[in-house]
Amino acid sequence: MLCQQMIRTTAKRSSNIMTRPIIMKRSVHFKDGVYENIPFKVKGRKTPYALSHFGFFAIGFAVPFVACYVQLKKSGAF
């Protein structure tokens, strides 16, 4: 008896889910196209993007070497 009741309630719930719209319409539209799907500006910049890109990674790469130099300088190795 309990099993049949559970089957009925499950069938009712699944039929309710199937009647809902699957795709929701959004009122916001973003521009599509080349360079529009990234959160920063690539074309039409004052400085080339490559300069900021490689500069960022160069600073990150240099930090451990600068830290080692400072620590060795403090210890009197240089």
Swiss-Prot record:
Gene Ontology terms for molecular function: oxidoreductase activity
Membrane topology label: Single-pass membrane protein
Propiece residues: 75-78
UniProt record, GO biological process: mitochondrial electron transport, cytochrome c to oxygen; proton transmembrane transport
A Gene Ontology term for the protein's cellular component: mitochondrion
Transit peptide (residue range): 1-27
Localization annotation: Mitochondrion inner membrane
Cross-referenced Pfam families: COX7C (PF02935)
Note: Present with 672 molecules/cell in log phase SD medium.
Homology family: Belongs to the cytochrome c oxidase VIIc family.
Subunit structure: Component of the cytochrome c oxidase (complex IV, CIV), a multisubunit enzyme composed of 12 subunits. The complex is composed of a catalytic core of 3 subunits COX1, COX2 and COX3, encoded in the mitochondrial DNA, and 9 supernumerary subunits COX4, COX5A (or COX5B), COX6, COX7, COX8, COX9, COX12, COX13 and COX26, which are encoded in the nuclear genome.
Role played: Component of the cytochrome c oxidase, the last enzyme in the mitochondrial electron transport chain which drives oxidative phosphorylation. The respiratory chain contains 3 multisubunit complexes succinate dehydrogenase (complex II, CII), ubiquinol-cytochrome c oxidoreductase (cytochrome b-c1 complex, complex III, CIII) and cytochrome c oxidase (complex IV, CIV), that cooperate to transfer electrons derived from NADH and succinate to molecular oxygen, creating an electrochemical gradient over the inner membrane that drives transmembrane transport and the ATP synthase.
Protein name per the record: Cytochrome c oxidase subunit 8, mitochondrial
Gene symbol of the encoding locus: COX8
